[in-house]
Amino acid sequence: MRKLCLDLGKKTCGFAISDVNQTIAIGLENFFYEEYHFYEVINRIKYYLEESEFQGQVDEIILGLPLRMDLSESKTTKMVKKFATVLAKNITLPIRLQDERQSTKNAEAILSQGGYNAKQKKLKKDSLAAQLILEDYLERQHHEKSN
């Protein structure tokens, strides 16, 4: 089964998905929506779960949790937690929160090193951040299984 990962923001949501063996994370898209219109994100998640080529293949949602460097919560952390609560009422899959500190900055650095300009970075950074979050999650899961 696959894992679907989200990097949620106020106006964009990066999506990534794992392979069926849960070893590789693949960026899917930067989804743009009206500010704070999270039902649009929920509808997009339902699309991936029910209508896309991944229909019936996802067993868990991974949601990036933007903690501060000292692990305290920010306004954005609270927004993501509230979204997770609403999402749980709309889907039956388990939702896991994954520390996403520095994921967007790391994604921007990778894109800069790749020669992407500002406009190109804007179109790719959130899906790449979701991919990095999912890679961290998968790595942690494999590490826990091997111990």
UniProtKB/Swiss-Prot annotation:
Class of the enzyme per the UniProt entry, highest EC level: hydrolase
Native organism: Metamycoplasma arthritidis (strain 158L3-1)
UniProt record, GO biological process: rRNA 5'-end processing
Keywords: Cytoplasm, Hydrolase, Nuclease, Ribosome biogenesis
Main location: cytoplasm
EC number: 3.1.-.-
Gene3D superfamilies on file: YqgF/RNase H-like domain
Keyword Hydrolase listed: yes
Subcellular location: Cytoplasm
Protein name per its UniProtKB record: Putative pre-16S rRNA nuclease
